């Protein structure tokens, strides 16, 4: 959970200090995501990041997971992410991490910049997350469970 709350703290610092120059990587990711996907306005991206800023506060995470009996089963869970809004697949990824499993993610081609920023942040700050989260570059193969969101087209990953 510290991995996740650490990202929430990064976002809180980014937005509360109004000193965005202290995190040029996040500033660049926001700009790149807006340029890459014309459906993602800067306002939509900022709103999504602010949403996750609140949801990834340590107390909010603790309240959320306290309702569940979590078991560390260590499945390899493939997460095929939608890209219809900024960070659409982040909830699924967070659920995999919190439940004690490993994630192999296939970011949507429409929303890979922000998701990749999240994963790279975790990998840099917490090197042990390299064993927990993998970004797949090819068609997914070796997994125990799968979460697929998006349209009916998502089914094509399984044919």
Segments (PLM) and residue ranges:
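N-terminal Rossmann-like NAD(P)+-binding subdomain of aldehyde/semialdehyde dehydrogenases
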Residues: 1-78
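Acidic-enriched, low-complexity/disordered segments with a strong bias for Aspartate over Glutamate
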Residues: 17, 32, 59, 92, ...
């Amino acid at each position: 959970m510290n991995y996740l709350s650490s990202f929430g703290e990064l976002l809180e610092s980014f937005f509360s200090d109004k000193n965005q120059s202290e995190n040029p990587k996040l500033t660049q990711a926001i700009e790149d995501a807006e340029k890459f996907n014309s459906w993602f306005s800067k306002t939509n991206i900022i709103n999504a990041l602010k949403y996750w800023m609140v949801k990834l506060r340590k107390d909010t995470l603790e309240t959320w997971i306290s309702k569940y009996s979590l078991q560390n089963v260590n499945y390899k869970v493939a997460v095929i992410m939608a890209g219809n809004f900024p960070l659409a697949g982040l909830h699924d990824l967070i659920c995999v991490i919190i439940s004690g499993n490993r994630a192999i993610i296939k970011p949507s081609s429409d929303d890979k910049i922000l998701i990749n920023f999240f994963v790279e942040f975790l990998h840099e700050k917490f090197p042990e997350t390299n064993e927990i989260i993998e970004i797949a570059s090819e068609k997914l193969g070796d997994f125990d469970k799968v979460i697929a969101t998006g349209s009916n087209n998502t089914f094509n990953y399984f044919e």
